[in-house]
Amino acid sequence: MSKRIEYIVDEILDQYMYADTSFRPWIIGFSGGKDSTVLLTLVWLALRKIKRDTITPFQLRRPIYVVCNDTMVENPIIATYVDEVLAQIETKAREEDLPIFVRKTEPKLEDSFWVNVIGKGYPVPNTAFRWCTDKMKIKPTARFIIEQVDECGEAIILIGTRKTESATRARSIKKHEVYGKRLTNHTILRNTYVYAPIKELMLEEVWYIINAIPSPWGFDNSILFNIYKDASADDYECPTVVTDKSHGSCGQSRFGCWVCTVVKDDKSMRSLIKNGREWMKPLYDFRIEIDQERNIIENRMPYRRDGRRAINDMGPYVFSYRAKMLRRLLEVQHDLQKHDPKIKLISDQELIAIQVNWYRDFNFGYQVSEIYNSIYKESFNMEENIKNKLEADLMKEICFENPEEGELIEQLLLLQRSKSLMQRRRGLKNEIESRLKEFVNNKKQ
C-alpha cells in the first residue's frame, strides 16, 4: 500500500475517532462505480484498524450508512452488479461487527421517469429541461439525509469526488473547501457537512486500489474493472497502474440512466454492445428513438398541463404517443427478458400509476392493461391494494375542498363492487338513486 493511501486511511481514522467526538452519522454516497468503491474501501480499512488497535468496541459507535440511489432506470448491468455488491457489503459488515449499514433510496412513484414521461406526458429531458435530476436523484437521497439530521442533529456526507476527474470538479472542490479544514458546509442541506477523503487521488491510484487491494467486503473487483473496460469508448484511454499485465485499457467510462437523453450518445452502452453485450441493443435503439421523436410537433399537445398555451405549441406528449411509447418500452422489456427474465424496465406500480394519470387527464381511450396484455399475452394483474391506494389518493386530491362528496363517491363505488362480486346487479340503479337522494337531503339540512 502506498504512503498516500496509508495517509488517507489514517486521516479517515482520525476524523472518525478524534477530530469529531460526536456520534453524528456518516453517509457514504455509493454508486458502485470506481470512486465510491475506493472511498468505501478506505473507510472500511480505517474501521478495521480502529477495531484492531483499540481495546473497547465503544470506539465504533458512529453509524456509517452506505446509501445507494436507484433511479429505477439504471443501466441493467450496473443495477445487477450494484445489488450484488450491496448484499455482500451488508453481509460482511454484520460478520465483522462493523457499524456499516446499507440503505437504498429511490424516487417516489409520482417522481419516477416513466410516470412523468408516459403518465403525465413530460418530454424526455434535454439540457434545457433537465427535470429528472432533481426528482430522481437529488430528492430521494436528500430525504434520507434530512431524516438523519432530524434524528441526530447533524450528519456528515462522505463523497468520492476527485480534483482530477475534470476541471469542473476541481473548481467545485476548490470553491467549497476551507484551508486546513476537512469538513465543509453542505451548500443546500442544513446541519450537514461534506467530507471528501480521496479528493487528491489520481486516476492511476484509484485503479491501483481496485486492482491491488482485495475488496474488504469480499467481492471480486475484477468484475468492476471488466465492466469499465467493456464500456470504454475508443476515444478514452485509461492510464492504468495495475498489478497484472493482462489488464488492458479500462477507460474513464461514466454510467448513468440507460434512458438518458441529455447526452448526445451513450458511449458506455455503445461500447458494451460492441464488446459482447448485444442483448442491450434494443435499449440503445429505444433511447435514440425517443430522443429523435421528442420535438416532433405531432407528438405534442399545444397546451401545458396547467392549461396555458405552450411555447411553440410544444406541451406534453399527446396520449397516442404516450401509448405508443409504452408499447415500445414493454416490447423492449419483453425482448430483454429472453436474455434475463429478472430484467424489468418498468415496475407494476408505475404501470398502475400511468393508468391513474391517464384517467386524471381524462384519457379513457387507451388502457395500460390492454397494451400490456397484447405484448405478454397474459392478464396484467393490478395488485388490488396498490390500485385502491392510488384511487384513494386521486379521490382525496379531486375532492379536497368537498371531502363529503369524496365519501359519497367511495360509497357508490363500494356499492357497485359489492353487487358485482355477488353477481347480482338487479336493484343497483335504485340503490344508487336512493343514496344520492339521501346525500342531497342531508346537504339541505
Task: Briefly describe each language-model feature range.
Residues G33:
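Catalytic cores of secreted/periplasmic lytic hydrolases that degrade extracellular macromolecules
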Residues M1-I27, S36-Q445:
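Nucleotide-activated chemistry modules centered on ATP-dependent adenylation/adenylyltransferase
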